[in-house]
């Protein structure tokens, strides 16, 4: 978890105590106990722990743009909420331009400042500002159902 990349090839640790302390501090903010698992292989972590760690790792270096593709899809509802709260916090703190792909209509309405619905490569809904704020889940679902009926689904 903490810079283990070179260990497989017999290389020494690529980190120092200050960096490990920084990782521990960042991971502690998640509230998932990951700060005590720096020696654990990533593959043995739960799906939620891996998603939280991946999100944190992807935003530790200076970036301006973040792409999230169904980053809560395989998680249980409680962990998905935690990941969304963490995502919202990181995006706001770092002022990141973010594209989040989701099929969770509540997340589509609740998060972000613009909502776009795509169908076969075309934009069929684009709402921002007050118009997005006033958009309901039912409105999005109605549009989705209309598209599904047109496609024969």
List the predicted regions and their residue ranges:
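Conserved ABC nucleotide-binding domain
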Residues: 26-43
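Helix N-cap at the start of a conserved alpha-helix in ABC-type nucleotide-binding domains
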Residues: 77-79
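Helical segment within the ABC ATPase nucleotide-binding domain
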Residues: 81-93
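Conserved beta-strand-loop-alpha-helix hinge in the C-terminal portion
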Residues: 122-146
């Amino acid at each position: 978890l903490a810079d283990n990349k070179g260990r497989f090839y017999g290389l020494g640790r690529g980190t120092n105590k200050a960096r490990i302390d920084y990782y521990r501090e960042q991971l502690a903010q998640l509230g998932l106990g990951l700060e005590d698992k720096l020696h654990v292989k990533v593959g043995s972590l739960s799906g939620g722990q891996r998603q939280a760690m991946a999100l944190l790792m992807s935003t530790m270096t200076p970036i301006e743009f973040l792409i999230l593709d169904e980053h809560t899809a395989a998680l249980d509802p409680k962990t998905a909420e935690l990941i969304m709260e963490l995502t919202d916090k990181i995006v706001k703190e770092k002022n990141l331009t973010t594209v989040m792909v989701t099929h969770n209509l509540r997340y589509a309405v609740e998060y972000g400042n613009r909502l776009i619905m795509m169908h076969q490569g075309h934009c069929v809904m684009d709402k921002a500002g007050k118009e997005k704020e006033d958009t309901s889940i039912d409105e999005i679902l109605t549009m989705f159902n209309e598209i599904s009926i047109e496609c024969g689904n």
